[in-house]
Swiss-Prot record:
Binding, S-adenosyl-L-methionine: 113, 133-138
HAMAP family: TrmD (MF_00605)
Name used for this protein in its record: tRNA (guanine-N(1)-)-methyltransferase
Pfam families assigned to the protein according to its UniProt record, in alphabetical order: tRNA_m1G_MT
EC number: 2.1.1.228
Keyword Phosphoprotein: no
Family the entry assigns: Belongs to the RNA methyltransferase TrmD family.
Function: Specifically methylates guanosine-37 in various tRNAs.
């Protein structure tokens, strides 16, 4: 996968290119990241990249000409088929389904805004899609872009150590992940669930699915509203609810 970055602070993306899963992907040639700074496309000695908004008001906007020239340079480098994305609070909210959708693109260009944003006409003429990582404001689009790159790169074949890892992540099936345990078997009196030590893969799968359903019901119940549960999933969720109620009753009785 090839990703182009339009940013006033391209050095921030070393966190992606030099470390962790994405760093290994870059090193192994599975992910290629190039960056363009609008500042390199300015024509004044101050390398100005911001301008006042029409109508007044606080703050500045990114200057149109350097930004457009940077986007055009990235498009030229990408060739045909690159999707241009603007990271924006007004965009579609990124979720696992969206990540999976974006991962089908072999070429992405991510435009990172700064100041109060970018000219609406640049969005209309240069941007294919707007994406947001949440209903809050950040100082720029770099962190959302890094979030998008990290999440999308997990779908690139060969990036993860285990091919099933991406499909077993939280939200991959619309559910939160189940609890995980490693050594020691007992930690401050808390034991690993016996089923995970049993070696019975069918029971382990069943336990993990039940816990995933139950955790989603407890913490993010609205996610379940969007799912059509299978007969097995509905049965396991009902079991979890019964067990949870029994545990709560037992806890209340001890209080």
């Amino acid at each position: 996968m090839w990703i182009g970055i339009i940013s006033l602070f391209p050095e921030m993306f070393r966190a992606i290119t030099d470390y962790g899963v994405t760093g290994r992907a870059v090193k192994n040639g599975l992910l290629s990241i190039q960056s363009w700074s609008p500042r390199d496309f300015t024509h004044d000695r101050h390398r100005t990249v911001d301008d006042r908004p029409y109508g007044g008001g606080p703050g500045m906007l990114m200057m149109v000409q350097p930004l457009r020239d940077a986007i055009h340079a990235a498009k030229a480098a990408a060739g045909e088929g690159a999707k241009v994305i603007y990271l924006s609070p007004q965009g579609r909210k990124l979720d696992q389904a969206g990540v999976s959708e974006l991962a089908t693109n072999q070429k992405l260009i991510l435009v990172c805004g700064r100041y109060e944003g970018i000219d609406e006409r640049v969005i209309q003429t240069e941007i294919d899609e707007e994406w947001s990582i949440g209903d809050y404001v950040l100082s720029g689009g770099e962190l959302p872009a890094m979030t998008l790159i990290d999440s999308v790169s997990r779908f690139i074949p060969g990036v993860l150590g285990h091919e099933a890892s991406a499909t077993e992540d939280s939200f991959a099936e619309g559910l939160l992940d189940c609890p995980h345990y490693t050594r020691p078997e007992v930690l401050e009196g808390m034991e690993v669930p016996p089923v995970l030590l049993s070696g019975n893969h069918a029971e382990i799968r069943r336990w993990r699915l039940k816990q995933s359903l139950g955790r989603t019901w407890l913490r993010r119940p609205k996610l379940l509203e969007n799912l059509a549960l299978t007969e097995e999933q509905a049965r396991l969720l009902a079991e979890f609810k019964t067990e949870h109620a029994q545990q709560q009753h037992k806890h209340d009785g001890m209080a």
